[in-house]
């Protein structure tokens, strides 16, 4: 149920107008993108979300609602309400673990997602890389950062191996181990892109786990594993630059020291992989 309004409303107004019988249960602060909170009434639970980035255009939040509206409920929460600065979606019962599931199980989830109809908007990384450079702390901008940005701009993004709907933020904290199988939450970066970009972006523990995930996916997708791994590797510098830039951007927004530590660690990874 989308609801358009140019006037933002408070949490209490949202609940009294649309969910008068529900009451807040708990607040979630997991992840790097910010929190959300849970509401409940007679055993029925919804998650109330807000945009993680206060400076992002409202269209980005609306796209998340549209993505959830077209995804099957077996892999994503069903949305119930959208309006300016608020979205209400199903609560997914299950365990959120601190480590990734078996690579074959995760490959199955991603392959199923990639078989769904496309969302209708492309993920393009270069505009984001440039935005993060422009919006970062000037004291943190280095010659090396600018050099890598120019190098990627000249090289252009890898040509997609297969174009599919992507989640683009797959890590242990965004995976719900439910009774009916794995499901994904936090779809704010979803869009259409290369399947290899999705695989490159998964927050794996080590290269061995990454290779196994790619091999398991390649088996399902009937792609030569070596071919898929080469394409995944082509995306590595783009993904590392994206992560480093996002951490720098969030550092300037929030002043949270964790983002500086994560940015520094990602810059070191970039130097190693060059």
From Swiss-Prot:
Keyword Kinase belongs to the record: yes
The EC number(s) this enzyme carries: 2.7.1.89
Pathways involved: Cofactor biosynthesis; thiamine diphosphate biosynthesis; thiamine phosphate from thiamine: step 1/1
Pfam families referenced in this protein's UniProt entry, alphabetically: APH
Family to which this protein belongs: Belongs to the thiamine kinase family.
Function: Catalyzes the ATP-dependent phosphorylation of thiamine to thiamine phosphate. Is involved in thiamine salvage.
Record protein name field: Thiamine kinase
Organism annotation: Escherichia coli O9:H4 (strain HS)
Gene assigned in the entry: thiK
């Amino acid at each position: 149920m989308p609801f358009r309004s140019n006037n933002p409303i408070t949490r209490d107004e949202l609940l009294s107008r649309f969910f008068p019988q529900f009451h807040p249960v708990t607040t979630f602060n997991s992840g790097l993108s910010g929190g959300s909170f849970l509401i409940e009434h007679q055993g029925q639970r919804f998650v109330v979300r807000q945009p993680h980035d206060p400076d992002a255009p409202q269209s980005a939040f609306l796209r998340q609602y549209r993505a959830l509206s077209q995804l099957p409920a077996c892999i994503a929460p069903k949305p119930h309400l959208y309006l300016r600065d608020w979205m209400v979606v199903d609560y997914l019962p299950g365990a959120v673990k601190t480590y990734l599931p078996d690579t074959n199980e995760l490959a199955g989830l991603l392959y199923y997602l990639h078989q769904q109809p496309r969302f209708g908007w492309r993920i393009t990384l270069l505009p984001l890389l440039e935005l993060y450079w422009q919006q970062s702390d000037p004291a943190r901008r280095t010659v090396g950062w600018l050099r890598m940005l120019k190098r990627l701009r000249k090289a252009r993004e890898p040509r997609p191996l297969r174009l599919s709907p992507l989640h683009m933020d797959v890590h242990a904290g965004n995976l719900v181990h439910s009774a009916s199988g794995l499901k994904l939450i936090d779809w704010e970066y979803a869009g259409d892109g290369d399947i290899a970009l999705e695989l490159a972006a998964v927050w794996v523990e080590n290269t061995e786990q990454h290779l196994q995930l790619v091999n398991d996916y390649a088996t399902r997708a009937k792609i030569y594993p070596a071919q898929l791994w080469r394409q995944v590797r082509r995306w590595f510098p783009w993904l590392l630059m994206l992560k480093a830039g996002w951490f720098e951007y969030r550092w300037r927004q929030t002043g949270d020291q964790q983002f500086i530590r994560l940015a520094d660690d990602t810059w070191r990874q970039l130097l190693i992989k060059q």
